[in-house]
Design a protein with these regions (language model features):
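Compositionally biased, intrinsically disordered low-complexity segments enriched
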Residues: 23, 115, 161-166, 182
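Conserved hydrophobic beta-strand positions in leucine-rich repeat
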Residues: 68-70, 81, 92-95, 108, ...
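Canonical position 11/12 of the leucine-rich repeat
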Residues: 75-79, 102-106, 125-128, 145-147, ...
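Short hydrophobic transmembrane-like helices used for membrane targeting/insertion
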Residues: 10-12, 19-20, 146, 188, ...
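N-terminal capping/linker segments that flank leucine-rich repeat
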Residues: 2-98, 103-118, 123-125, 132-137, ...
Length: 278
């Protein structure tokens, strides 16, 4: 009788132990905390199971992470995200939409992501610092709190966008591969683009820029500088220009066949109102 009771007890204990081990294994499995689709794109992180300080693994199951694409206000719950283990990372996108004002994320570090080419960040209102890897080709920053950027090592950078933030200065002198520079609603008063001979398109909107020298940018196709303090634009050395947009009253020096649009104060006001609605 005792032997039978002992056997039953052993079986029960074994079952309980298996359940406990299975539960622990399930909780600690990356597949249970991270979702990677068939395109090797990380699209979901279970913050409840991970906690607010995220460490992204190199792979989940047999899927190596090449893209991080987090687009939802849900991700505003992330306080920090460590991607240093993701050695094959090529694209990083973080879009918080309406949750951006609640975000506590202050820093992103991509120094160990040697294959990373594209960084896009939007509505991370607390974000103060980004450290890039030298191979980055595209940087798009919208609605951040970044005041300073160090892009000196980004020799391959060809597209730079910064919208809606307190950026006060930008040094692009080492980024000679740039063909697009778009800056809107920032605090930049001066910018030097003399060394950017490959530059094709520039946008400066809503910045206190007082002058813009494009005399050394022969490949420019589009210049849009309005809602600024620029009063004179010399296009004498820009034979490829097709589009020019400036504030009403801006003096354009030099002959050009480009299509010219003059923005009035009323135009700017309507544009600002439309932006608020969106």
């Amino acid at each position: 009788m005792k032997s039978k009771f002992l056997s039953v007890t052993i079986v029960i204990l074994s079952c309980v132990l298996m359940i406990i081990l299975s539960s622990c294994n399930r909780i600690n499995t990356d597949e249970d905390r991270f979702f990677v689709d068939n395109d090797n794109r990380l699209r979901m992180i279970d913050i409840k199971k991970n906690g607010p300080d995220i460490v992204v693994p190199e792979k989940v199951g047999d899927k190596v992470i090449r893209i991080i694409y987090l687009e939802d206000s849900y991700f505003s719950k992330i306080d920090s995200i460590d991607v240093s283990n993701v050695s094959e990372l090529e694209y990083f996108t973080l879009e918080l939409w309406g949750g951006g004002s609640y975000s506590k994320l202050k820093r992103l570090d991509f120094r160990k992501n040697k294959k990373l080419r594209d960084v896009t960040v939007n509505r991370t209102k607390a974000l103060e610092e980004i450290i890039f890897n030298k191979n980055c080709e595209t940087v798009c920053l919208f609605n951040t709190y970044i005041k300073e950027l160090d892009l000196k090592l980004l020799k391959k950078l060809n597209h730079f966008t910064y919208w809606h933030g307190p950026l006060e200065s930008i040094d692009l002198s080492n980024n000679t591969n740039l063909d697009q520079v778009w800056i809107k609603n920032a605090n930049i008063k001066t910018v030097d683009i003399k060394k950017l001979k490959k530059l094709k398109s520039i946008v400066f909107y809503g910045v206190p820029l007082e002058e813009l020298d494009i005399s050394n940018n022969p490949n420019l196709v589009a210049v849009r500088t309005y809602n600024t303090n620029v009063k004179v634009l010399d296009v004498s050395n820009n034979p490829k220009l097709k589009f020019i947009e400036v504030d009403e009253g801006t003096e354009i020096i030099g002959e050009t066949n480009a299509e010219i649009k003059y923005w009035t104060k009323e135009d700017i006001e309507r544009l600002e109102e439309k932006s608020k609605d969106n």
